[in-house]
Curated annotation (Swiss-Prot):
Pfam family of the protein (one): RNase_HII
UniProt remark on cofactor binding: Manganese or magnesium. Binds 1 divalent metal ion per monomer in the absence of substrate. May bind a second metal ion after substrate binding.
Chief location bin: cytoplasm
Single Gene Ontology MF annotation: RNA-DNA hybrid ribonuclease activity
The reaction(s) this protein catalyses: Endonucleolytic cleavage to 5'-phosphomonoester
Provenance organism: Streptococcus pneumoniae serotype 2 (strain D39 / NCTC 7466)
The encoding gene: rnhB
Coiled coil: none
Role summary: Endonuclease that specifically degrades the RNA of RNA-DNA hybrids.
Gene Ontology CC terms, in alphabetical order: cytoplasm; ribonuclease H2 complex
UniProt key word Nuclease: yes
Protein name (Swiss-Prot/TrEMBL): Ribonuclease HII
Length: 259
């Protein structure tokens, strides 16, 4: 009779719920064996569910594949709302029918998985572009226009250039066909890939800024207006990376000028 360890090793090779190996092993009454069978079945079901989820997130891409297009770029940004730091956009072209396990809207990915999935996108993407627009430009042109500039910069870095743009809820003034998708980072794998690239890139930048400007907790809050960030603003004032067109930074700058 096989040991439970041997059965566990055998079950790792089973990829289908209908496998005859399950039928054979279910005759074994040992609780340890039944536990391993249940565990493996749950793992297979989870893989099937994940594959279906990824498949559903390729619906926009598949429509474009039918039209003969393959160089499809997903575009997304991170950093519209913070009081400090740049807005970062990423543009990612994935291979046809590419499925990266765990890839999703970056806001839905556990933080501990960010770097792993970011690396998987880096490894599998045909091309990646990153656009970074700093706080000074944001203050000059407004955050909406700065976001478009970041996206255009990211697209300009791609090689080869894309045949179609999938963009999260925006339209760009570019001579390339495009589709604007509401909640695109949750509905398109290409946009989700751009979402995680932009997120990790910006988070790493804000960690560097945390070293340059301690006291604002940038490494944790990424420039968003948390209690610690606002406390830092009150105690230490405005840094060169703060957006002076955003409140309460704007009022702090005006108050300093008036005094």
């Amino acid at each position: 009779m096989a040991t439970i360890k041997e059965i566990k090793e055998l079950l790792v090779t089973v990829k289908e719920l209908e496998s005859p190996i399950f039928l054979e092993l279910e005759k074994d009454n040992r609780s340890g064996v039944q536990k391993e069978i249940s565990k493996r079945k749950r793992a297979i079901q989870a893989e099937l569910d994940e594959n279906l989820r990824l498949e559903s997130m390729l619906s926009y891409e598949k429509e474009l594949y039918k039209q003969g297009l393959t160089l499809i770029v997903g575009i997304d940004e991170v950093g519209r709302g913070p009081l400090a730091g740049p807005v970062v956009a990423a543009a990612v072209i994935l291979p046809k029918n590419c499925k990266i396990k765990g890839l999703n809207d970056s806001k839905k990915i556990p933080k501990k998985k960010h770097l792993e999935i970011f690396q998987a996108v880096q490894d599998q993407a045909l091309s990646i572009g990153i656009g970074i627009i700093d706080n000074q430009v944001i203050d000059q042109v407004n955050i909406y226009e700065a976001t478009k500039l970041a996206m255009q910069e990211a697209i300009s870095q791609l090689s080869p250039q894309p045949e179609h743009l999938l963009i999260d809820a925006m339209k760009l003034d570019l001579p390339i066909s495009q589709t604007s998708i509401i909640k695109g980072d949750a509905n398109s794998l290409s946009i989700a890939a751009a979402s995680i690239v932009a997120k990790v890139t910006r988070d790493e930048l804000m960690k560097e800024y945390d070293q340059q400007f301690p006291g604002y907790d940038f490494a944790t809050n990424a420039g968003y207006g948390t209690a610690k960030h606002l406390e830092g603003l009150t105690k230490l004032g405005v840094t060169p990376i703060h957006r002076t067109s955003f409140e309460p930074v704007k009022s702090l700058v005006l108050g300093k000028k008036e005094s």
